[in-house]
Amino acid sequence: MTGLDEALTRIRFTDTGLVPAIVQQWYTRDVLMMGWMDAEAFRRTMTEGRVTFWSRSRQEYWRKGDSSGNIQFVRGVALDCDGDTLLVTVDQVGAACHTGTYTCFDADPLAPVLGERPESAADGW
């Protein structure tokens, strides 16, 4: 069994065969975006040096930057403690978001609503 085969056995894909992949700039640790991968997208990401995703809407593989030039070069891939989410660290060239912003999380931040939590909530809620 290769290292890639072993890694694939550790990933807990959804019932539809997908796993969320959080993309993070390797040197700033900024979270850039989230995309979906299936086993083939994971294999391509691990062997080609560029991040490949599976588009749920278009039902096809895509790589960030193929049309925009905003390429994501893979620096590392980690699996979370539950085995159901990937963290892909990249060297991002240009904007990560399809809107042209550096990160997909630059938009309207949501304010916490701590004053509205239930009385029965623990302090750690």
UniProtKB/Swiss-Prot annotation:
**What's one Pfam family the UniProt record gives for this protein?**
PRA-CH
Q: Where does it mainly reside?
A: cytoplasm
What broad class of enzyme is this? hydrolase
Keyword annotations of the record:
Amino-acid biosynthesis, Cytoplasm, Histidine biosynthesis, Hydrolase, Magnesium, Metal-binding, Zinc
Q: In which pathway does it act?
A: Amino-acid biosynthesis; L-histidine biosynthesis; L-histidine from 5-phospho-alpha-D-ribose 1-diphosphate: step 3/9
Top-level taxon: Bacteria
What the record says about family reads:
Belongs to the PRA-CH family.
Q: PANTHER family per the record?
A: HISTIDINE BIOSYNTHESIS BIFUNCTIONAL PROTEIN, PHOSPHORIBOSYL-AMP CYCLOHYDROLASE
Task: Specify the protein name.
Answer: Phosphoribosyl-AMP cyclohydrolase
**The organism's lineage?**
Bacteria, Bacillati, Actinomycetota, Actinomycetes, Micrococcales
